[in-house]
Amino acid sequence: MGTVRSQIRPGLYAITDNRLTPADTLIVSVEAALAGGARLVQYRDKGSTASERLVQARNLNSLCQGFDVPLLINDDPELAARVGAAGVHLGQDDCSLVDARRLLGEHAIIGITCHHSLNLAQTAVDGGADYLAFGRFYDSATKPGAPPASPDVLTEAKALGLPITAIGGITGNNAEPLIRAGADLVAVVGGLFGGQPSDIEARAKAFNRQFARHHPLFSLSE
């Protein structure tokens, strides 16, 4: 798939949630998101057992590989290594970037949560992160206690030279200002998977149409 950076393409970043994408609908839901053009997928499950997560992550990785889309694992470099996922996403209280890089290697994608802080972002850049995630920008059921962020941080973070992800309460109705402010990806949980499974593909396409209008490097043909 080329260099690490080339794997991170502008567009929709689909994030699973075991409450919205339980085991019996996980694969069909993510497949619909991929069919709709998701450019990155993160497996996030805070409720299943380790053995269940292993099976689900393996199945998701096979699915994502079929679409040539990277799968990242939330907060668990060891699971990412076991299933051969493309990388991990780490929060500020999770495994260190250094330890994750040591385990997964130089070709893994490692994203870092930076909340609303350019200082945290600079630390992540210095540590070798591959993308930076800022948010929450809107009220979020997934992380209701997360500190709010202003779209201005997306614009300012562009100077750091890494792909920028916006997260937190994003829907098809409020994503546009974040893309205009500089988001290369919008990470979406409930705004993608919170409705009927039959609507997921259309929701994904709607996000990417906004990128087609407002992101200079986005192409619907990719």
UniProtKB/Swiss-Prot annotation:
GO biological process: thiamine biosynthetic process; thiamine diphosphate biosynthetic process
Family: Belongs to the thiamine-phosphate synthase family.
SUPFAM superfamilies: Thiamin phosphate synthase
Cofactor binding note of this UniProt entry: Binds 1 Mg(2+) ion per subunit.
EC number from the UniProt entry: 2.5.1.3
Name this protein carries in UniProt: Thiamine-phosphate synthase
GO MF annotations, alphabetized: magnesium ion binding; thiamine-phosphate diphosphorylase activity
Pathway connected to this protein: Cofactor biosynthesis; thiamine diphosphate biosynthesis; thiamine phosphate from 4-amino-2-methyl-5-diphosphomethylpyrimidine and 4-methyl-5-(2-phosphoethyl)-thiazole: step 1/1
Chain residues that bind Mg(2+): D75, D94
Naturally occurring in which organism (per UniProt): Marinobacter nauticus (strain ATCC 700491 / DSM 11845 / VT8) (Marinobacter aquaeolei)
Gene name of the record: thiE
Catalytic activity: 2-[(2R,5Z)-2-carboxy-4-methylthiazol-5(2H)-ylidene]ethyl phosphate + 4-amino-2-methyl-5-(diphosphooxymethyl)pyrimidine + 2 H(+) = thiamine phosphate + CO2 + diphosphate; 2-(2-carboxy-4-methylthiazol-5-yl)ethyl phosphate + 4-amino-2-methyl-5-(diphosphooxymethyl)pyrimidine + 2 H(+) = thiamine phosphate + CO2 + diphosphate; 4-methyl-5-(2-phosphooxyethyl)-thiazole + 4-amino-2-methyl-5-(diphosphooxymethyl)pyrimidine + H(+) = thiamine phosphate + diphosphate
Keyword presence, Repressor: no
